[in-house]
């Protein structure tokens, strides 16, 4: 099935709010094996919304709108959809009941009540995180317009609870979707290795890159879940076999989730010393459930004095080699492990930019070290062509640190080579 997304909100056009809704919906459609044709963004203007809606209905089987379902005058998505589809708004009794339950004994303003009015013939989607229900409105035979609230905290539960099951039923098939996640190979190299697998129609195999990682989604359709999984799993195994040990998991949330689980399984602890990443690595670890079992100390040692006082980095080493050096990265990893009683220590120091670089130590140069009781490993991240920004450099460095620890605990070589312009050891 073909789908289009229409994101509604002037704040999106002005850049005041990042359009994460389209990303969430796009990922959900991809997981269902649907083809996303276009994403439109329109302001709070009924005429422009109507034009975008009519254009989308000429091409797509499913049109999904996000935003514009609230109680204010500029929330006009339902009214516009009702007009375009010829489905007048009607009070939806169950939505009204839920709205009254939400407000309890508090008075409900008249404009709040309009949220319980839905286009005639709609299938309502309850909003367990807010007041505005979503709905699916039938268009011509086999066509639907799905209306979702704008706040991600409301949209995401509705997607999971109501929209995805609805679309699965409408598609007449059960979808099995697997995400193979990798770090250490570029999209081009990966695509060459799995080129023949991407030619299949069921399952489909689609590689794409994000945040210096490369993902491969395998999606199969069948009459039931068991049959869909049986179609997909041999292809997932083939992808893993072709890509090798750069694969760090299937249907996992990220490198940090894998590392925390490895630490828990091995009953090992981690301490971290960061300079240029400013606590990002520690944040990624502590975002994971169960992190407190394996992670006790995370230090941001920006200043040389902090590196010496808190980690034991020798002053003469800093004076001789500078804070951004392999020697200091190693000392940070060893110092944080030894001083704070952990099994593993990670140290990161570099020039995240955009300023501060020199000819000898350019912007983007980062040293990442991993220490255990009997060894220290180092990766050097050197700038590869165009500087991609401070956040990119910090994210990449933290991912390298996680990957080094992941590989060590899996019994793989830590100082691996890199392809497609990723940093070289």
Curated annotation (Swiss-Prot):
Protein name: CinA-like protein
Entries under Gene3D superfamilies matching the protein: 3.30.70.2860, CinA-like, MoaB/Mog-like domain
Family note: Belongs to the CinA family.
Tree of life domain: Bacteria
HAMAP family in UniProt: CinA_B (MF_00226_B)
Pfam families xrefs: CinA (PF02464), CinA_KH (PF18146), MoCF_biosynth (PF00994)
SMART domains referenced in this protein's UniProt entry, alphabetically: MoCF_biosynth
Alphabetical list of InterPro entries matching this protein: CinA, CinA-like_C, CinA_C, CinA_KH, Competence-induced_CinA, MoaB/Mog-like_dom_sf, MoaB/Mog_dom
């Amino acid at each position: 099935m073909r789908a289009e997304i229409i994101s509604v909100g002037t704040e999106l056009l002005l850049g005041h709010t990042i359009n994460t809704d389209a990303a969430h919906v796009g990922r959900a459609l991809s997981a269902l094996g649907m083809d996303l044709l276009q994403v439109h963004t329109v302001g709070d203007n009924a005429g422009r919304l109507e034009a975008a809606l009519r254009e989308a209905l000429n091409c797509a089987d499913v049109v999904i709108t996000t935003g514009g379902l609230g109680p204010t005058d500029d929330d006009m998505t339902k009214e516009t959809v009702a007009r375009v589809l010829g489905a007048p708004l009607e009070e939806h009794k169950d939505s009204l009941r839920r709205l009254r339950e939400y407000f309890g004994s508090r008075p409900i303003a008249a404009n709040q009540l309009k949220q319980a009015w839905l286009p005639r013939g709609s299938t309502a989607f309850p909003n367990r995180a807010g007041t505005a229900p979503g709905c699916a409105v039938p268009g011509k035979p086999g066509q639907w317009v799905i209306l979702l609230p704008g706040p991600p905290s409301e949209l995401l539960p509705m997607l999971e609870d109501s929209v995805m099951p609805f679309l699965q039923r409408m598609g007449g098939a059960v979808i099995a979707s697997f995400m193979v996640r990798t770090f250490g190979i570029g999209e081009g190299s990966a695509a060459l290795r799995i080129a023949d697998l991407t030619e299949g129609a069921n399952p489909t195999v689609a590689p794409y890159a994000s945040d210096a990682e490369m993902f491969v989604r395998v999606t199969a359709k069948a009459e039931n879940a068991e049959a869909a999984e049986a179609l997909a799993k041999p292809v997932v195994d083939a992808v893993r076999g072709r890509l090798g040990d750069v694969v760090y998991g299937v249907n996992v949330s990220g490198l940090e989730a894998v590392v925390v689980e490895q630490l828990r399984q091995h009953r090992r602890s981690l301490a971290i010393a960061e300079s240029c990443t400013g606590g990002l690595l520690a944040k990624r670890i502590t975002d994971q459930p169960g992190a407190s079992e394996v992670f006790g100390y995370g230090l941001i040692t920006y200043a040389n004095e902090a590196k010496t006082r808190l980690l034991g980095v020798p002053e003469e080493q800093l004076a001789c080699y500078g804070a951004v050096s392999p020697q200091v990265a190693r000392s940070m990893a060893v110092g944080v492990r030894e001083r704070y009683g952990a099994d593993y220590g990670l140290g990161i120091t570099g020039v995240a930019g955009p300023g501060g670089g020199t000819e000898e130590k350019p912007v983007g140069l980062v040293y990442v070290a991993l220490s255990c009781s009997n060894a220290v490993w180092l990766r050097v991240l050197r700038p590869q062509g165009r500087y991609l920004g401070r956040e990119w450099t910090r994210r990449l460095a933290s991912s390298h640190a996680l990957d080094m620890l992941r590989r060590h605990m899996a019994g793989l070589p830590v100082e691996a080579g890199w392809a497609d312009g990723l940093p070289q050891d």
